[in-house]
Amino acid sequence: MRNIFNMSTKTETVKRNPADSMVSTWRHDRTQWSLWHWMIELLGLHLIDLKGEVPVFSKKQKIPAVREWTLHLWILLHAAIPLALHHAFVKYTGQNLGLLAAFGLYSTAFKLNGIHEMHIMRRLGQLYGFLDGDKHPRDEIPDVGVGKVIRELISTSTFRMIMAIYLTYQPNETPSTMSWQWLPLEIGIYSITVDFWFYWYHRLMHSTGPLWKFHRRHHLTKHPNPLLSAYADHEQEFMDITGIPLLAYGTMKAMGLPMGFYEWWVCFQYIAFSEFIGHSGLRIHGGAPSTLNWLLELFDAELVIEDHDLHHRYGWRKSHNYGKQTRLWDRIFGTCLDRIESVKDNVDYENRVTMPLL
């Protein structure tokens, strides 16, 4: 007979893949920094200022509402800067920019706009705090992912512009030839079209086992910050950076919309702004600006920051809130998740947030 009192108990320990670690300690020890660490530091890409104090609010405290027109103003002003420089060059020289020069101008502007938006969001975070801040701080870039995050962010602004220039840039078309009368409609339709393709691709990534393995890294963060919008496997990043925008562009052309290079540039700035702010977790009621938000709001289908934040917080294989530009397709296909802090009765429309221009 076996002596059960002398039996040794063997406990199995499940070891986590080190590549899945979200531990972030690198900001406190500069001795091991690489070029990527210094880029984040010198460009000021941190969402949280270690020297500042982030306010913390309970979920029942009112959440301030954003003046959406200030988001449009910010995006359009920053999109207009390279267009104005391009126009000035044409006027001064009588020649248009070549392909390489156009790529250099617009891809650089893309990167600078993203850096400036990050600075603004850090300032807003110091003023208004972050969603679910009473339970958990925002995730930082993990020690194992610093280089990957920066390389993917650079790739976004680089390869999107390579694609746009290759497909749409015409040496005989200057910024003054932009289809201004179509631009407001194109901005709104493009975000909805991008979101249609993204919704189904994103939903399939969650529901299909062979695809989930390419998306799970992105869901290691439960309280993301904007830089972690690029924390994903290469297969996902390929679709995010070029695949989905290309499908949306083809759809727009099939609809008969002009969608030339300059209009696409402006649409890209709207999409990139929404991707960044949607991963910011800022405790403000606002999010993806669109020229058609007035229509989306009639169906409770506009997207605010909390929507994608909840997707990360509670989503894994089974999830909700798959859209990243609107809630239209989530609303149509029944995958909306109830808001917590951005519910209508908890929004303070008297306490308005203005997006700083500088």
Please annotate each region the language model reported:
Residues 1-216, 220-258, 321-358:
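Non-catalytic, topology-defining segments of multipass membrane proteins
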Residues 257-346:
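C-terminal transmembrane module of eukaryotic multi-pass membrane proteins
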